[in-house]
UniProtKB/Swiss-Prot annotation:
Gene behind the chain: efp
Function of the molecule: Involved in peptide bond synthesis. Stimulates efficient translation and peptide-bond synthesis on native or reconstituted 70S ribosomes in vitro. Probably functions indirectly by altering the affinity of the ribosome for aminoacyl-tRNA, thus increasing their reactivity as acceptors for peptidyl transferase.
Domain of life per record: Bacteria
GO molecular function, a single term: translation elongation factor activity
Official protein name in the record: Elongation factor P
Localization per record: Cytoplasm
Family the UniProt entry places it in: Belongs to the elongation factor P family.
Length: 186
């Protein structure tokens, strides 16, 4: 059980038979009446977002999520197949379960798969990944690091804004949380 006063961004709770993750929260203490916590919750299974208000100090069941490190091995008929490298057990996730993470997911990558009651829910990518640029405007002599940016398409199909001096075939480091360019990778 967790108190509504202890909510933080990313806290997972069980509500109405499903797992919800706190996206935003605000402790409100009005001049008259009792304090409450206004939250924005996201359903982990479906991705729907709702706003819900709880009394301050209200006890709610905390969702016990299990994280396991698995390797993305291949895709089969729209499903993403992951393997536990110690037990060689396979886990399948649909494109909906993976969500936006699929734009950075490539074969051989190790990720954390979050499960609840033995059912895989979602994939957590590393904070940064190294990917190759497959398509972008060519770099022109004189372009500098302090100049502007241009769109580049990466090997997984993701589009990221990169500095003007980068060209096709170069490997770059990308922040998976906000789709930003972090730097060149050798």
């Amino acid at each position: 059980m967790i108190s509504s006063n202890d909510f933080r961004t990313g806290t997972s709770i069980e509500l109405d038979g499903s797992v919800w993750r706190v996206v935003e929260f605000l402790h409100v203490k009005p001049g008259k009446g009792s304090a409450f916590v206004r939250t924005k919750l996201k359903a982990v299974q479906s991705g729907s977002v709702v706003e819900k208000t709880f009394r301050a100090g209200e006890m709610l069941p905390q969702a016990l999520l299990e994280k396991s490190t698995l390797q993305h091995t291949y895709m089969e008929s729209g499903d993403y197949v992951f393997m536990d490298m110690s037990s060689y057990e396979e886990t399948r996730l649909t494109a909906q379960q993976i969500g936006d993470s699929r734009k950075y997911l490539k074969e051989g990558m190790e990720v954390n798969v979050v499960s609840w009651n033995g059912n895989p829910l979602e994939v957590e990518l590393p904070n940064s990944v190294v990917l190759e640029i497959t398509e972008t405007d060519p770099g022109v002599k004189g372009d500098t690091a302090t100049g502007g940016t241009k769109p580049a398409i990466l090997e997984t199909g993701a589009q990221v804004m990169v500095p003007l001096f980068l060209s096709v075939g170069e490997k770059i480091k990308v922040d998976t949380r906000n789709d930003s360019y972090l730097g060149r990778e050798n």
